[in-house]
Amino acid sequence: FIYDETRKAPVIDLDNGKRYEFYTPDDTGTGTSFKSLIIFDLSILKLTPLPAIAHDSLIFKNIGDAPIDKIMELYMQSKKQIFISLDKDGAYSEKTRSILNKTAVLHLNEGGDELFGRSWNKKDATQGGL
């Protein structure tokens, strides 16, 4: 569980296999929407043969610290692969940082720690610059 029983859980309404609605009653906030998306993805990962999921840093930014901690615990419980990309690990709680440090496979940073050794969005010396 992400929250105790005082919070409303996300709901999925299926309509004859042609469409669906996925929402959290009375909460249309961005953080709640992204948290619900993560829970949905984890449910699909657990209940299907899908071997892995990936979550980008964008979906974590508006989720509070306590729910992020619980999401990290759920990630740890999975027997399947989960790939996540996070910016600014210092922005997360000590619990989440600890989980990330124990389980990280790859750390990327500026200054030589980029994938393939360089930043793709910067001009090199042959391209000129300001």
Annotated model-derived regions:
Residues 43-47, 66-72:
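Charged, polyampholytic interaction/assembly segments that form long, compositionally biased interfaces
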Residues 31-52:
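GG-anchored amphipathic helix commonly corresponding to the ABC/SMC/Rad50 NBD signature/C-loop
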Residues 1-31, 47-49, 129:
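Conserved NTPase motor "head" modules and their coupling/switch loops across ABC/AAA+ ATPases, GTPases
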Residues 68-130:
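C-terminal lobe/lid and adjacent interdomain/linker elements of RecA-like ASCE P-loop ATPase modules
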Residues 29-34, 62-66:
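Active-site-adjacent loop/helix micro-motif of nuclease/hydrolase catalytic cores
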Residues 1-2, 40-43, 75, 96:
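Hydrophobic, Leu/Ile/Phe/Ala-enriched alpha-helical segments that form helix-helix packing faces
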Residues 23, 54-56, 83-85:
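Conserved beta-strand segments of the P-loop GTPase G domain that flank and frequently precede/overlap
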Residues 48-63:
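Conserved P-loop NTPase "ATPase switch" module shared by AAA+ and STAND
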